[in-house]
């Protein structure tokens, strides 16, 4: 970014004159790294710490950030402010050291709110679909030449980054309800994709508390702001009378302000008619599979239409949409002959979905786009608490595939909970009689175990939010071939 562009940007961003260096604890996370990347491009000195290098830390290092792969008090010695994610414990030595010398310690969302304060903020919230919808909004605005800043929780494939600094007044950001930190944000426009029970430890196990928090978030909009909400979602429909702001509804429902009709899917592409008030219908070709992605697209189109973006830019952005990282990510087609000696090929897909609703949407998209394929899912449950709280839902949804390989629960720092483990879940699914799960407690044996079950024309879904994404990449790199030393699961 040149000096003239940076000077233009400063008209939208507070200069924080006394801030010398901004330190991020847990900087390798997508959300944290995205904000750090925007601030680095704005000219601020960035430092941060994490336990191991990854693509995010490498990107930041290339931008001049100082990254430490440890957590030590001396790492924050030059910091003016310390930014932390909800995943970082309060007894982290860097947080303790910062508080001892009175360096401000703030949440990630507080820094995002600072970026948004002097911009036209568009915040995308909801239990599912936030990351993809954020990328879709950013894609439309970029196609229209509006050069937005965006901060996303996942990789925006077209840009190759999680976040990007633009020169316009628009800031498009994923808003995280997992720790209720999205209440720091004060956007001009807010999208709510859906509301379901998740992260309930944040809300004391009280769903009413979660619903009220979403209402409070919407009331951060100015009175002239707008809420764009999916009326297909029963909880959103219930909450509409409590939202004291201008509302645009969207969905497949007949009473939606902006409706989806005549949805069709062919492979990884969807198409639908977008019906709107006071304007002609649009036939949208969407380069993303599934009815859930049609809903994400219409949310993005609703915001763009409200802003006055022309139909040509909207249609082109949706046609060329490249998706986000680990959202029905097609990793390729692989010949079986070197995998297990059989003829034919299989398709490998990686997907981040880890809530039953998300997993169900992925399965339905796969069934609709590839109806002749057998679905083979490798599923890694994420968190013991989520497995416990949504146990029956997981059992129901996972019974919808043809072959199921189950990895152990990815704990995300949680202690095991009796009865909320993968072995118990396999037993329950097996008892329902639709699929006979294969438990794979040792991930080293997965390639060999998977090779044993694969057949011609299979679609393999690598599903979950833990380490299963890295496993998917390794499988793709090896072309699904078990490597020497990898045992077979008996």
Swiss-Prot record:
The metabolic or biological pathway listed in the UniProt record of this protein is: Cell wall biogenesis; peptidoglycan biosynthesis
Q: Which UniProt keywords apply?
A: ATP-binding, Cell cycle, Cell division, Cell shape, Cell wall biogenesis/degradation, Cytoplasm, Ligase, Nucleotide-binding, Peptidoglycan synthesis
Entry superkingdom:
Bacteria
Reactions it catalyzes: UDP-N-acetyl-alpha-D-muramate + L-alanine + ATP = UDP-N-acetyl-alpha-D-muramoyl-L-alanine + ADP + phosphate + H(+)
A Gene Ontology biological process noted in the UniProt record is: peptidoglycan biosynthetic process
Write out the function statement from the record.
Cell wall formation.
What family name appears in the similarity comment? Answer: Belongs to the MurCDEF family.
Q: What is this protein called?
A: UDP-N-acetylmuramate--L-alanine ligase
Species of provenance: Sodalis glossinidius (strain morsitans)
């Amino acid at each position: 970014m040149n000096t003239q562009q940076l000077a233009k940007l400063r008209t939208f961003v507070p200069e924080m004159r006394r801030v010398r260096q901004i330190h991020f604890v847990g900087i390798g996370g997508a959300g944290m790294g995205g904000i750090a990347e925007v601030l680095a491009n704005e000219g601020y000195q960035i430092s941060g710490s994490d336990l191991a290098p990854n693509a995010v830390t490498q990107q930041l290092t290339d931008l001049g950030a100082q990254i430490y792969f440890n957590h030590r008090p001396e790492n924050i010695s030059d910091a003016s402010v310390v930014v932390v994610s909800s995943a970082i414990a309060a007894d982290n030595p860097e947080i303790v050291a910062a508080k001892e010398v009175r360096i401000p310690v703030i949440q990630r969302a507080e820094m995002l709110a600072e970026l948004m304060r002097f911009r036209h903020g568009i915040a995308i919230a909801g239990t599912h679909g936030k990351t993809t919808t954020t990328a879709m909004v950013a894609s439309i605005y970029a196609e229209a030449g509006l050069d937005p800043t965006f901060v996303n929780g996942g990789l925006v494939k077209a840009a190759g980054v999680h976040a990007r600094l633009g020169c316009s007044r628009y800031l498009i950001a994923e808003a995280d309800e997992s720790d209720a930190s999205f209440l720091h944000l004060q956007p001009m426009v807010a999208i709510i994709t859906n509301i379901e029970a998740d992260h309930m430890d944040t809300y004391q196990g009280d769903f009413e508390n979660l619903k009220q928090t979403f209402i409070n978030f919407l009331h951060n909009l100015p009175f002239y702001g707008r809420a764009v909400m999916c009326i297909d979602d029963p909880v959103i429909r219930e909450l509409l009378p409590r939202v004291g702001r201008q509302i645009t509804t969207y969905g497949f429902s007949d009473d939606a302000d902006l409706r989806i009709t005549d949805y069709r899917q062919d492979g990884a592409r969807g198409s639908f008619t977008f019906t709107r008030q006071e304007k002609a219908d649009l036939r949208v070709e969407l380069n993303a599979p599934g009815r859930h992605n049609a809903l994400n697209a219409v949310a993005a189109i609703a915001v763009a239409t409200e802003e006055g973006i022309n139909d040509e830019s909207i249609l082109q952005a949706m046609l060329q949409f490249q998706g986000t990282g680990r959202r029905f990510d097609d990793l390729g087609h692989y010949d079986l002959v070197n995998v297990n000696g059989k003829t034919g090929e299989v398709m490998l897909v990686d997907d981040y979905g880890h809530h039953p609703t998300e997993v169900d949407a992925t399965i339905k998209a796969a069934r609709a786009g590839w109806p002749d394929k057998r679905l083979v899912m490798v599923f890694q449950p994420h968190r013991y608490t989520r497995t416990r709280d949504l146990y029956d839902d997981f059992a129901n949804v996972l019974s919808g595939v043809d072959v199921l390989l189950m990895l152990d629960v990815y704990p995300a720092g949680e202690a095991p909970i009796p009865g909320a483990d993968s072995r118990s879940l396999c037993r329950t699914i097996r008892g329902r009689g639709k699929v006979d799960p294969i438990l794979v407690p040792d991930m080293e044996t997965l390639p060999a175990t998977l090779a044993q079950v694969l057949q011609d024309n299979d679609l393999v879904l690598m599903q979950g939010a833990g380490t299963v994404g890295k496993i998917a990449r390794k499988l793709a790199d090896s072309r699904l071939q078990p490597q020497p030393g990898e045992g077979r699961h008996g």
